[in-house]
């Protein structure tokens, strides 16, 4: 369930980010997991949520099969297509060498790309090739980058080619 109320905030993860900023000395975590279905904004070419799970809107979200009913259910973004994207308005990036890993499943080869920042500070990441996995979940090192300062960055994941199912990505920093 996700709130669609926007009276007291500008984007869905803003409340969570306020907690990260002001209630913890570890706002700049060494490792940070970002769930795909928890994006703030998205563009999906299909007209509805084909998985009919987790949130309203047309982002295709499904449950991972085989998760015991007494365990936390995991969701993932499915039925992706080239040209679709997911955006997180603010994610915390600590200073240091950052490795981004992606957990995905794909029946055919796919490609994604991360973009960071806004306006004149917007930076495209490399195109990441995701080999076919036979539909099995795998986590791969997508790329590394340098972050000079602690900061909150807009992050956009773009589907470049293929139809990967996307579970999460992690941001890990080595200082």
Give the label of every model feature segment.
Residues 1-175:
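Extracytoplasmic
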């Amino acid at each position: 369930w996700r709130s669609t109320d926007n009276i007291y905030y500008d984007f869905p993860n803003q409340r969570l980010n306020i907690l990260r900023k002001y209630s913890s000395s570890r706002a700049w975590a060494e490792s940070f997991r970002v769930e795909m279905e928890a994006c703030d904004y998205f563009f999906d070419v299909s007209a509805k949520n084909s998985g009919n799970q987790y949130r309203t809107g047309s982002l295709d979200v499904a449950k991972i099969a085989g998760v015991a009913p007494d365990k936390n259910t995991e969701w993932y973004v499915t039925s992706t297509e080239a040209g679709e994207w997911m955006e997180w308005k603010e994610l915390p990036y600590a200073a240091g060498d950052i490795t981004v890993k992606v957990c995905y499943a794909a029946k055919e080869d796919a490609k994604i790309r991360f973009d960071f920042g806004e306006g004149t500070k917007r930076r495209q990441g490399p195109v990441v090739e995701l080999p076919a996995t036979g539909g099995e979940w795998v986590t791969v090192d997508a790329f590394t980058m340098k972050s000079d300062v602690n900061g909150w960055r807009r992050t956009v994941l773009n589907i470049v080619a293929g139809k990967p199912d996307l579970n999460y990505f992690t941001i890990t920093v080595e200082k």
